[in-house]
Amino acid sequence: MDEKPGFMLIRTKSIAVKKPYIQVNPPLMTIYFVFDDDKENSALSWFDANLPAPLWTTQNADNGHCHHCYKLEIPLCTSEFASIKAIKYAQAVYYAYALKLGADLSYSQLITKNPLHPQWRTTYWT
């Protein structure tokens, strides 16, 4: 997503890392589970839900809304050559975490708040 809301542009990595929103997962691969938590002051929702600490949480300082990012131990292939069982298992885990967090179930995970951008309050938990 560029500075103007409503559209996304593919950028080189050197440019993308300077933007407020980034795509953390490459096409056809899931390395990170990202959860959109739109409750006020939701930085510790994972703790309140008795979930493991995410790798990082990026928080909007104005309203407290957060993105929680968990790095998978083993990246998940999502191409046509992937294991359907592995994909379904990962979806079940993601859904269970989203329910416990009270996260937005319609969030696509395509882009997330860039943890390196000064617009967000970022906490690295692990």
What positions do the PLM features span?
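Signature for HUH/AEP ssDNA processing cores
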Residues: 1-66, 72-88
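Catalytic "initiation/cleavage/transfer" segments centered on a nucleophilic residue
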Residues: 1, 6-13, 19, 38, ...
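Short C-terminal domain-edge/linker segments immediately following a structured domain
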Residues: 63-69, 98-103
